[in-house]
């Protein structure tokens, strides 16, 4: 009987992942691409339902991922070296979970094999986001959906 091989996200550290493994941790929820507001009093980060101008509102995928930082200079690039900063990511985020030594959820495409499960389980904001250009920045506070952490 062959020994069971643990999935790469269990048996490897973030630093040991190759680029394809790293990218595959993304569940495609798009939550990290929502505009966020920071409370000046306690530094809490709040997610809005307002999507980055490059985020496809239905698929929750970046429309220009390879060149995103050219169009959106403040786009945050997640890397294994920044894992200690992942607390602002949603608790369901594959990057955050693996950085905390946790397993991926059953709906994650690496576990279930279905990239649409994140939408079927309503983890993503697909169909519930607003385009960045449709809401004045001073009105973003009216569209808060949850607090990070």
Swiss-Prot record:
Cysteine disulfide links: none
Span of the signal peptide: none
Coiled-coil regions listed in the entry: none
UniProt record similarity statement: Belongs to the UPF0260 family.
Protein name stated in the entry: UPF0260 protein PFL_1499
Naturally occurring in which organism (per UniProt): Pseudomonas fluorescens (strain ATCC BAA-477 / NRRL B-23932 / Pf-5)
């Amino acid at each position: 009987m062959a020994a069971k091989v643990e999935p790469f996200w269990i048996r490897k550290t973030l630093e040991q992942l190759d680029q394809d493994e790293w990218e595959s941790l993304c569940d495609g929820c798009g939550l990290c691409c929502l505009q966020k507001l920071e409370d000046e009093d306690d530094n809490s980060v709040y997610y809005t339902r307002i999507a980055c101008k490059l985020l496809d509102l239905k698929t929750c995928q970046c429309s220009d991922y390879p060149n995103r930082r050219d169009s959106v200079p403040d786009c945050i690039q997640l890397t294994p070296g920044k894992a200690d900063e992942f607390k602002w990511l949603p608790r369901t985020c594959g990057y955050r979970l693996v950085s905390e030594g946790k397993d991926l959820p059953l709906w994650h495409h690496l576990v279930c094999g279905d990239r649409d499960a994140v939408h079927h389980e309503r983890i993503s904001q697909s169909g519930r986001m607003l385009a960045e250009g449709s809401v004045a920045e001073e009105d973003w506070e009216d569209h808060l959906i949850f607090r990070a952490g």
